[in-house]
Amino acid sequence: SCGAEDGAFIYLDDILFSGNRIGSDLSLWIQQAAPAKAIVHIFVFIVHSLGEWQMMEKLKDETIRAGKKIDFHLWRSMTLENRKSYRNSSEVLWPATITADANLIAYIDQEKKFPFEFRKTGGSLKNNCFSSEEGRQLLEQEFLLAGMKIRALCKNPSNAMRPLGFSAFGLGFGSLIVTYRNCPNNCPLALWWGDPESPRASPLSKWYPLVPRKTYGRAIDFDVVW
């Protein structure tokens, strides 16, 4: 029961994107503070399917490595599809085509380890967040081109800094979920990258973000009306 010495543990978050934040927090807990046996309930609003699989595998491995028996239960109100094998039914930005932009084509061609695979149109979506296929493709193309412009502003951009959002592969994570608290870096760069308060010589000053991002290191004033 709640509050009992042998009761379940609860982890609360808003959205599970890559699963790295929850996975890192709970991995550290497993190593340093978790009892030998426990049940953990993870509550979020929305889950992305690839992140769920990666996170649960990570937690399972950490539990085995620690020699403990911990059961994890993930609760959500919605699951959005973003696995590569189900890209035709993806519920994130996943381009079906690209414009004839030389820089974009070169960027795609340089990815050798995980070559980008285009989405085929006509896939069935459980949670259709797009008004139409035409509207979706327009959004994907414009965010792609804007993201490429932003990458060009950076002298040595991180490999994970992709046009459609931070990701280890593809053209970016492609999330369109923004909450009143923050804009995740899994969203297209055009939404959050840049800082109008940076010095003019800084590349960050060259792009005004639509939804300025608050990083973990920056204090958040919850009394501010956004």
Predicted segments — roles?
Residues 2-5:
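A short acidic-Thr-Gly-centered motif at the start of a beta-strand
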Residues 8-10, 41:
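Structural motif
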Residues 12-21:
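Ser/Thr-glycine-rich phosphate-binding loops at phosphate-binding pockets of nucleotides
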Residues 27-226:
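PRPP-dependent phosphoribosyltransferase catalytic core
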